[in-house]
Amino acid sequence: MKRTKSIHHASFRKSWSARHLTPVALAVTAVFMLAGCEKSDETVSLYQNADDCSAANPGKNAECTTAFNNALKEAERTAPKYATREDCVAEFGEGQCQQAPAQAGMAPENQAQAQSSGSFWMPLMAGYMMGRMMGGGAGFAQQPLFSSKNPASPAYGKYTDASGKNYGAAQPGRTMTVPKTAMAPKPATTTTVTRGGFGESVAKQSTMQRSATGTSNRSMGG
C-alpha cells in the first residue's frame, strides 16, 4: 500500500509540474518575442538637408551629402506624381512643387502622356530620415519625407513618407524610434495621383496608426 501511495504521489507531482510549466514557458516565449520586437526598431534622425546632418555629425560631411543626395533620388522615384501643377499645389501648397524628372518611376504609357501634356509634378522633398551612423560611417539608410503647407491637407505641417505614413511635426533636428520597415525603399510611383489623393492616404495611415497605438496601450494596461 505504501508503495502504491508513493507512486501516486510521484504521478501527482509530475502532473502538477507539467501543468504549471506551461504558463512559465509562455512567459519566457513572450519575453523573447518582446526582445525581438525591440530589435526591429531603429533610431533615426530627421534632417532638412545635408548641412543640418553635418552640423549634428561633425566630421561626417561626405556621408551626410551622400545620404541627402540618395534621399533626393529616392524622392524622385517614389514621391506622389500629379498630372498638373495645380493638382500638386492644391495638395502641398504654393512653392512646394516641382516638375518630376523624366523616367522618375513612371510607367512608359504615363511617360508618353507626360511628353504630350508637358510633364508630371511632384512635391519638393521637405526633409529626410537617416539611420544612426555605425562605425566607419557605414550602415546607415535614408528615407525622403514630404510635408504640405496647405492647411486644408491632412499632411499639413507634418512629415510623411511616400506611402503617406505620418512621422509627426515637420521639424528637423528631431530623433525618434521607428520600425526598421520605415527605412525600407518604397515602391516606385507608376501612376498619377488625383487631387487630394495623397492627403486621403495620409488620413487613412494616421487613423491606422492611432488604432494600432490604442490597441497596444489597451493590451499593456490589461
UniProtKB/Swiss-Prot annotation:
It comes from the Bacteria. Disulfide bonds: none annotated. Residues 203-222 have a biased composition (Polar residues). InterPro entries: Biofilm_formation_YgiB. It holds the Pfam family DUF1190. Residues 177-222 are annotated as: Disordered. Belongs to the UPF0441 family. This is UPF0441 protein CKO_04429.
